[in-house]
Swiss-Prot record:
Record keywords, A-Z: Mitochondrion, Transit peptide
GO CC, alphabetical: mitochondrion; nucleus
PANTHER family (UniProt xref): NEUGRIN (PTHR13475:SF3)
InterPro entries documented for this protein: NGRN/Rrg9
Species in which this protein is naturally found: Aspergillus niger (strain ATCC MYA-4892 / CBS 513.88 / FGSC A1513)
Protein purpose: Required for respiratory activity and maintenance and expression of the mitochondrial genome.
Region Disordered: start-end pairs: 76-181, 259-284
Biased composition (Basic and acidic residues): 157-175
Pfam short name (any one): Neugrin
Compositionally biased residues, Polar residues: 268-284
Domain of life where this protein originates: Eukaryota
Compositionally skewed regions (Basic residues) per UniProt: 133-144
Protein name: Required for respiratory growth protein 9, mitochondrial
Gene designation: rrg9
Length: 284
C-alpha cells in the first residue's frame, strides 16, 4: 500500500482552506455600509450571494472534518494547530451570518410597513363623495326605470256632456249657483211675472239682488217652461203650509214668535218627546 506524505498534506489542504476562508472573511469586512445597503435593497442578489456562501461553507465543513480526522491519525500536533486555527474562523462565520440575517430582516420589515401605509393611503374609503355619487346615480337610474311610462298607455275616456256642463259651471260660478234658501212657488211665479211685465226694469241681476239668490238661479227660473198641474199645486201648497207652521213653532220656542194652538204640536220638543203618540192619546 502506498504511503501518504504528511508534509504534502500539511502544505496543501489546510493551507488552501485557510486561505479561502480568510479571503471570504476579508471581503466581507472590507465591504462598507454602502455595499450592505445595496445588498439589502436588492434581495435577489443578497439571497443569491447567501445561497452561494451557504453552499460553499457547507461543502467546506465535511472536508474540514475529514481532513481533521485524517491529520489526527497522522500527526496529533498538526490536528491541534488546525483546530486552534479553525475555531476563530467558525466564530467569525457565525457573526457574519447573524449580521446578514439582521440586514435581510430589517428591509423586509420596512418594506412591509411602507407597503401597508401605501395601501391605506391608496385605498379609498367607502364614505368618499365619489362612492356616494355613484350610489345616488344607481338609485336614480333604478327609479327612472321603474317610473317609465308604458309604451301603450290606456286611452283616456272622453268626458260626457253632463261632466263638461258641470266643469263649465264651476269655472263660471266659483261660489256655486244653487240658492242658499228655497223659494216658494209664489216667489217663483212672482219672478216670472215681474220679468214678463217689465224685462228691461226687472233684469236678472236686479231680481237676484231682490230675492237674495244667485243670478244663475234667476236665469234658470226664467228659462224653465215647466208648469205644475192642479194636483201638484195643491200638494205643494199644503207642504209649504206645514213648513211655515214648523218654522213658527221653532221660533216660538226661542221666544221670537207667540205660541199658537196650531203650531204647538209641531214644536221640536213635542216631536222629540211624544211624536205622534200625543195625538192618539188626545183622541182616546
Amino acid at each position: 500500500m502506498a504511503g501518504v506524505c504528511a508534509s504534502s498534506l500539511k502544505l496543501s489542504l489546510p493551507n488552501v482552506l485557510r486561505n479561502a476562508l480568510r479571503s471570504e472573511f476579508a471581503s466581507d469586512v472590507h465591504q462598507g455600509p454602502a455595499s450592505r445597503r445595496i445588498l439589502s435593497i436588492t434581495p435577489f442578489s443578497q439571497s443569491r450571494y447567501k445561497t452561494q456562501r451557504r453552499n460553499f461553507s457547507a461543502s467546506i465543513k465535511p472536508q474540514l472534518c475529514q481532513s481533521a480526522i485524517y491529520l489526527s491519525a497522522q500527526d496529533p500536533s498538526s490536528s491541534a494547530s488546525f483546530s486552534s486555527n479553525t475555531a476563530p474562523l467558525g466564530g467569525s462565520e457565525n457573526e457574519i451570518r447573524r449580521a446578514s440575517t439582521e440586514a435581510n430582516a430589517s428591509p423586509e420589515r420596512n418594506d412591509t410597513k411602507t407597503s401597508h401605509a401605501d395601501y391605506l393611503a391608496e385605498a379609498p374609503s367607502s364614505d368618499t363623495p365619489t362612492d356616494k355619487k355613484r350610489t345616488k346615480s344607481s338609485r336614480s337610474k333604478k327609479r327612472s326605470r321603474h317610473e317609465e311610462i308604458p309604451s301603450n298607455p290606456m286611452p283616456q275616456k272622453k268626458p260626457e256632456k253632463w261632466q263638461l256642463h258641470k266643469q263649465a259651471l264651476k269655472e263660471k260660478f266659483k261660489d256655486g249657483w244653487n240658492p242658499s234658501k228655497k223659494l216658494s212657488p209664489d216667489a217663483l211665479e212672482g219672478i216670472r211675472h215681474l220679468h214678463a211685465v217689465a224685462p228691461e226694469k226687472f233684469t236678472t241681476p236686479v231680481l237676484a239682488e231682490e230675492f237674495k239668490v244667485s243670478p244663475e238661479a234667476i236665469r234658470r227660473i226664467l228659462k224653465s217652461k215647466w208648469r205644475p198641474s192642479e194636483t201638484e199645486i195643491e200638494d205643494r201648497r199644503k207642504r209649504w203650509e206645514r213648513r211655515h207652521d214648523r218654522i213658527w213653532g221653532h221660533l216660538s220656542e226661542l221666544g221670537l214668535r207667540p205660541s199658537t194652538k196650531r203650531t204647538r204640536d209641531l214644536t221640536d220638543a213635542n216631536q222629540l218627546l211624544y211624536g205622534n203618540n200625543q195625538k192618539k192619546g188626545g183622541k182616546a
